[in-house]
Amino acid sequence: MTGSASVNSFYLQMCFCFFLLMLVPQGLRGESNFTVAAASSKIEATLTGDALKVSDSQLKQWVQKAADAVVAYYGRYSVPHLTLQIRSFDGRGVRGGQTFSRYGGFIRIAVGTQTTEDDLNSDWMLTHEMVHLTFPNMQDEHHWIEEGIATYVEPIARIQAGQFSASRMWFELVRDLPKGLPQSGDEGLDHTHTWGRTYWGGALFCFLADVEIRKQTQNKKGLQDALRAILNAGGNMLYDWPIEKALQTGDRAVGVEVLLKLYEQMRDRPMQADLDSLWKQLGIRVENGAAQFNDEAPLAKIREAISAPKPQS
């Protein structure tokens, strides 16, 4: 081959490669990976899709904070190894969180291309999904307790990790917990699978149990102790447990039979709860879009203990 032919061939190849590059969307980021430590566990994250406004390091910090919140509440992480798939979507915010037991623990979640660091710092969804891994897999009729625990524990875990405020948590609980109260035609938590009863009805169960455990143990134990015991007994999402086994495990850990009895009251019938009276006893009043506290209220110490940091051991 002559020198002239070689040069022409080289330029043709270069032009063809440049043409192929032009066909790739400019915003496509391809795939990248990072690993986060969560106590003695490992989270392996994969990012796919279009380029994001936030950096990989900011995404890594977001994952780390969610993991830290779970460790703060449970004293450990839920599974030895979590696979986390982060996808992009055209927009802003975090959405589409789903948690599965496959691969030893798998979470899929989406981050918008226009999402900011502040959006990630205020996100609750990834923590919510991670909490799902801390409780045994339930039969379909008990899905309310899976969502209820994730809904109730998530803000408390973030408070204990220094990521959220107790005043904001109580404001949101006063605002949203009534969504979990039974409505006309309700047949109990095991038989009423509406959005309100599944998420907020489950959270209502957790809240009532937390307060009652603390009342019966002179505020020495709470729902957090029960949930830690369930996880420490091997009750994470990788395993199927009967709901009775999980609740009995929690009751034994706190030394009082609250969880199982409350379940018996709420599973088949629409048990009402006087939330207004409870807020008053806990010393919580909402004014001008914020929670105000009365530290002289009868159950004020219980209110404080619910979100207070707890040693890991």
Where is each model-derived feature located?
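Boundary at the C-terminal end of the N-terminal hydrophobic targeting segment
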Residues: 29-30
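Juxtacatalytic substrate-recognition/specificity segment
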Residues: 34-138, 142
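Soluble non-cytosolic domains of exported or imported proteins
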Residues: 53-65, 116-121, 125, 140, ...
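Acidic/His/Gly-enriched intrinsically disordered linker/tail segments
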Residues: 141-210, 215-217, 223, 232-237
